[in-house]
From Swiss-Prot:
UniProt similarity note: Belongs to the phospholipase D family. Cardiolipin synthase subfamily. ClsB sub-subfamily.
Enzyme Commission number(s) of this protein: 2.7.8.-
Protein known as: Cardiolipin synthase B
Organism: Escherichia coli (strain K12)
Subcellular locations according to the entry: Cell membrane
Regulation acting on activity, per entry: Activated by phosphate. Inhibited by cardiolipin and phosphatidate.
Keyword Iron annotated: no
Pfam families referenced in this protein's UniProt entry, alphabetically: PLDc_2
Main enzyme class: transferase
Miscellaneous information on this protein: All three cardiolipin synthases (ClsA, ClsB and ClsC) contribute to CL synthesis in stationary phase. Only ClsA contributes to synthesis during logarithmic growth phase.
Catalytic reaction annotation: 2 a 1,2-diacyl-sn-glycero-3-phospho-(1'-sn-glycerol) = a cardiolipin + glycerol
Length: 413
C-alpha cells in the first residue's frame, strides 16, 4: 500500500487525555458500523474502564468492533475485563504476546507501538496517547504531556485501508529484497492536506525518518520538534545542525523530567553536539513529556506515535500523519511555544557536560552503540511475530503472522 496526499480534511489538535479521551469516547458512542482501535497500552484503570464501557455499548448495539493491543505494552488485562468484550462480539487481539521469564517481559523488540482509532470510515484519531490515567492531569506530577489529532475527510479512507490491509487474513506478496520509498512529495502544497506515513519491518522501514530528513532540508525559517525519546542516528543529527547553520531557528523540546532516567542520560550525551551546532535545546520540566510532534515554517507539521530513537525509527510498528495546513501549524506552534515559555529550561553552556576524556569516551561509546543498536538486534535469532485472538472463553488461539495476519479460518474477519 502506498498513500498520497489527501486534500479537504478537517484537522483538530488534541492535547492530553482531557481533550483526547472525550473526543474518542464520543466518536465510539456515535459509531454505526465499524470501530478499529489499536494501541500499545491499555490499562484497567479509570480511563481504561471508560474505553471498555464505550466499546461494550457499541458492540451491544451491533457495531463491529476490533481491537489490537501490543503483547508487551498491555500484558495485564484481567480475563473478566476482556471476556465481557469478547462475549459482546468485540474482536480482541494481542500482537506478539509471549510468556514471561522469571516474571519479566521478554518481547521488548519490534513492538506494535501505533495508536490509531477509525470510526465508520468517517473519523480517525492518530497520535501518541495510550489508554491510561497517566495521560490525565489528575494523575499528578507523573502525568504525561502528549498530543493526537482528530481527522475527518479523505485521509480517513487511507487510514481505514491501511488498517484493513493489516488485519488477519490479508496476505501480501513478500519480497526478498528491501524497497526504500522516497518521502512522498506534495507537488501542490495547499491547506487541509494530510498524508499517512508509517514504519514497518518490510517495505516502509524508514519512511517516517525520511519525511523528517526532507523537512529539515526544506526548512527556511523555523523548526520545532517535541519528542519524548530523542536519540536519532547521525543522519538526523547532522541534518539538524546543518539546518541551524544555514540560519534556520531550531527548537528541540525533550524530557527534563523523564519517566525513565536513561532517557535523560541518552539525550544529554548529544547536548554538546547540538548546542554548539546552533540548536536550541529545551528541557520540559513540568512533567514527563510523551509527545511526538514537530512543525516546520508555517505549513508543515507531524503528529503520531513515532519517537526519534532506535526503537521507533528502526524496530517498532509506528504511524504518523504529515499535515500541510497553516491554521494547524499555528495552533501547534502556539502550544509548543507556550510550554517553552512556561515549563521549559533552555540548555546553555553551563549545563553542558564537561569535555573530559572520560565524558567524551562515554559519549562516543553510547552514541555508536545506540546508532548500531537496531543492526545488533537484527543478529538475534529471528522469530515470526504472532497474533493471539481472544475468543470466549478467554483462551487465546495463536496464529503465526508477520504483518498481523493469520491462516486460522476460525478467526473473525
Amino acid at each position: 500500500m502506498k498513500c498520497s496526499w489527501r486534500e479537504g480534511n478537517k484537522i483538530q489538535l488534541l492535547e492530553n487525555g482531557e481533550q483526547y479521551y472525550p473526543a474518542v469516547f464520543k466518536a465510539i458512542g456515535e459509531a454505526q458500523e465499524r470501530i478499529i482501535l489499536e494501541t500499545f497500552i491499555w490499562f484497567e484503570d479509570d480511563v481504561g474502564k471508560q474505553l471498555h464501557a464505550a466499546l461494550l455499548a457499541a458492540a451491544q448495539r451491533g457495531v463491529k468492533a476490533e481491537v489490537l493491543l501490543d503483547g508487551y505494552g498491555s500484558p495485564d488485562l484481567s480475563d473478566e475485563f476482556v471476556n465481557e468484550l469478547t462475549a459482546a462480539g468485540v474482536v480482541f487481539r494481542y500482537y506478539d504476546p509471549r510468556p514471561r521469564l522469571f516474571g519479566m517481559r521478554t518481547n521488548v523488540f519490534r513492538r506494535m507501538h501505533r495508536k490509531i482509532v477509525v470510526i465508520d470510515a468517517r473519523i480517525a484519531f492518530i497520535g501518541g496517547l495510550n489508554y491510561s490515567a497517566e495521560h490525565m492531569s489528575s494523575y499528578g506530577p507523573e502525568a504525561k504531556q502528549d498530543y493526537a489529532v482528530r481527522l475527518e475527510g479523505p485521509i480517513v479512507e487511507d487510514i481505514l485501508q491501511f488498517e484493513l490491509e493489516n488485519l488477519p487474513g490479508q496476505s501480501a506478496a513478500r519480497r526478498w529484497w528491501r524497497r526504500h520509498h522516497k518521502a512522498e512529495e506534495n507537488r501542490q502544497p495547499g491547506e487541509a492536506q494530510v498524508l499517512l506515513v508509517w514504519r514497518d519491518n518490510e517495505e516502509h522501514r524508514d519512511d517516517i525518518e525520511r519525511h523528517y530528513l526532507k523537512m529539515l532540508t526544506q526548512a527556511r525559517r523555523e523548526v520545532i520538534i517535541a519528542n519524548a525519546y530523542f536519540f536519532p542516528g547521525y543522519r538526523f543529527l547532522h541534518a539538524l545542525r546543518k539546518a541551524a547553520r544555514r540560519g534556520v531557528r531550531i527548537k528541540l523540546i525533550i524530557q527534563g523530567e523523564p519517566d525513565m532516567p536513561i532517557v535523560r542520560v541518552g539525550a544529554r550525551l548529544l547536548y554538546n553536539y547540538l548546542v554548539k551546532g546552533g540548536v536550541q535545546v529545551f528541557e520540559y520540566r513540568r512533567r514527563p513529556l510523551h509527545g511526538k510532534v514537530a512543525l516546520m515554517d508555517d505549513h508543515w507539521a507531524t503528529v503520531g506515535s513515532s519517537n526519534l530513537d532506535p526503537l521507533s525509527l528502526s524496530l517498532n510498528l509506528e504511524a504518523n500523519v504529515i499535515i500541510h495546513d497553516r491554521h494547524f501549524n499555528q495552533t501547534l506552534r502556539d502550544n509548543l511555544n507556550g510550554i517553552i515559555a512556561a515549563d521549559c529550561q533552555q540548555v546553555d553552556e553551563t549545563m553542558l557536560p564537561k569535555r573530559t576524556w572520560w565524558n567524551l569516551t562515554k559519549s562516543v561509546l553510547a552514541f555508536h552503540f545506540l546508532r548500531h543498536f537496531p543492526a545488533l538486534v537484527g543478529w538475534l535469532p529471528a522469530h515470526t511475530p504472532r497474533l493471539a485472538q481472544v475468543d470466549p472463553p478467554a483462551q487465546p488461539t495463536m496464529e503465526t503472522q508477520d504483518r498481523v495476519e493469520t491462516e486460522n479460518t476460525g478467526v473473525k474477519p
